[in-house]
């Protein structure tokens, strides 16, 4: 199964390239004239991870996406009408950190935002961890919860409480808090056993579980 999926990645990348707009962002639907913020972050993350795992990724597409992300980061303003607006910003920052181009100033500004959502807090902590600042990530996590209220969002971040728990799970893995990660992993597994799940839940849960398995199986756990 893994080999089959791996062989599909080059074709998937080619299909994703076709959704990139002149702005560097990516459309949710093929042919749409508008970039979707969350989808742009997801596709960017996929491209970065593919590149890090040895796949050939278009440098031009990736560079254009990075410029789009950085502009969106700088243009970000809080939006009281949409509570998870900060989560979108945190995801942008995470993807840029993953690419090795962290926007440290924007990360610090978002961290100091009053009433930062729990979802944004977890994702931003991941960004700090990926950027090599695990001490800051750990400080943030100490004040975050995992008891996300049940919800299912059909737009914006396409979120749900199981997806958000998966984000928290990966954050705990990144900061090497394996006991906490194991606890959340059980909750994520229970949520995913209900028989149906959203694409976001599958994507984030699979990635987080794989990260946890990698740490546990290799013993690659470091302390600062």
Segments from the language model and where they lie:
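Large, well-folded core regions of big proteins
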Residues: 1-224
